[in-house]
Amino acid sequence: YNVPDHTIDRARSGYEVYDDGNKGFVIAQFYPRMAVYSDVEGWQNSQFWGRDEFALPFGDFDVSITVPADHIMDATGVLVNRKEVFSKEMMRRFERATQSFDAPVMIVTQAEAEAAAANGVANGIPTAKKTWRFKAEMVRDFGFATSRRFIWDMMAVKIGNRDVMAVSMYPPEGNPLWEDWS
């Protein structure tokens, strides 16, 4: 899979190069799909074209993605190796976010994202890597986002009898709008 520059063709998946030379990746619809049979239209075998959608069955995903160690990442499902990929401070903030039902908790602040971006540009291509592992059950698709430049916040939300995490990841250019409305 060749990751496209989504600023050229406006695809919903791809990378964007920021003014400082760093990239942000938002990756979806990147793996082969099985055709779906519908009793209304028969076999749905159209490939994805731009803004169209697939007819996808529900499935389970267990995905490991290796990225530069200074990147943060989130994806469909649950991060199952959080303690391996989060710093101690990120873990403390995450634990606080799981109890914060009234306001988002910053997992990665703007200052931290900007410092990571500056270090990434100064140090060139990183050699250290981290593997993030996500599991998702009964979902139609899997996607992920990663960058060293992302600000990251989380907040617990009660849906029925379950607590889930509402998550926002965005580059510093998204502020103050995203931080105010996340």
Model-derived regions, located:
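Short acidic/polar inter-strand loop motif in beta-rich domains
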Residues: 2-9
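Short edge-strand/loop segments of extracellular domains
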Residues: 13-34, 82-84
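Hydrophobic helix-coil surface modules that form long, contiguous segments used
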Residues: 32-43, 49-182
